[in-house]
């Protein structure tokens, strides 16, 4: 499970979690991109996440499950990713609801998603939160600040219009590529900006 790469140790495992916020397309596209790699992907989807995934994408549970190596029930606090001894390259919560953000910002590991996020932070691994809400209240902003101070990276899926995307898919791909880049994971979704 562990390999040496350019003088650093990497663990070929990552966690992807869907908290139930609108924007399930981001989580789905992230899983599709990770499926193209040799990484072991651990997936947690909350009950609200399943509802949004079905409603927003039309994807069935079976289709979603084929995109991950391991699916963990959001209630299973004894899962491997709930322990710091299970090493991962990091974790992406896509999309990240404001409820999940609040729980992560304040260390509330009340389900597997928030527990795994807490473990990721305490082990000093990268945690990327693709927060989805607009407009933002002062409470949301303070929770983003607290999560950032704890070590999380707030990465809202904001379209990069300077790239002149031709479709919604290209906008989604760019946001997912940014999240993968933040974990140092391979992605073939969007290239680097080269200027004009």
Region spans (language model):
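A cross-family phosphate/adenosyl-ligand binding-site feature
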Residues: 8-196
